[in-house]
Amino acid sequence: VTSISRIADEVVEALKPEETTDGVTRTISYWDPLGVCACITPWNFPMGMPQTLMMPSLIAGNTALFKPSEEVPLVGIEYAKILNKTLPSDVLQVVVGTGEQGRELVESDVQLITFTGSQATGKHILEHAGKGLKRVLLELGGKDPLIILEDADLDAAAKFAASNSFRNTGQVCVSTEKIFVM
């Protein structure tokens, strides 16, 4: 709940009308919802990733088609049931299945696609989304460095490196994968 409140606060702030002027003219920019957003999430954080990817779209007034990983479809279905208790009817719908259903979702008439997963799948999404000039947000796995500076507490850095490298069996896009000591 705290995370959703934080996300809501950030979205509301980001969507405030922006006013600019050059002294002669005044322009006010308003943000409108995009429409239907596809949210394709990985298996390793079956509630955290959908929340991070989907909630901003919903709070901004969009609808969402949520495709959880085929490894954890029941978690996605149950999470959507919880959210749908407070959302208007049909604002959030779940699509379950394999990559084939993901491809069909990407090729459907959605305005935004969010995806966290492999680079190979991300490339396919970009290829198909580009044909429809769809907006795309991708997180394709990082190669995250831990940078240890000269004045660092080496014991604390070593503990952090070990725990962060193997968190969730090391299958986290922000796990430490390399260490630079300055």
Where are these regions (language model features)?
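N-terminal Rossmann NAD(P)-binding subdomain characteristic of aldehyde/semialdehyde dehydrogenases
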Residues: 1-54, 87, 91-93
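Hydrophobic packing residues within well-ordered alpha-helices of enzyme cores
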Residues: 4, 76-79, 105, 125, ...
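A structured beta-alpha segment of the ubiquitous adenosine-cofactor-binding alpha/beta core
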Residues: 26-27, 94-111
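PLP-dependent aminotransferase-like
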Residues: 32, 50-102
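Beta-loop-alpha module in the N-terminal Rossmann-like domain of NAD(P)-dependent dehydrogenases
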Residues: 37, 44, 96-104, 117-124, ...
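General beta-strand structural signal in soluble alpha/beta enzymes
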Residues: 66, 94-96, 115-117, 136-138
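ALDH superfamily catalytic-core signature
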Residues: 87, 112, 120-182
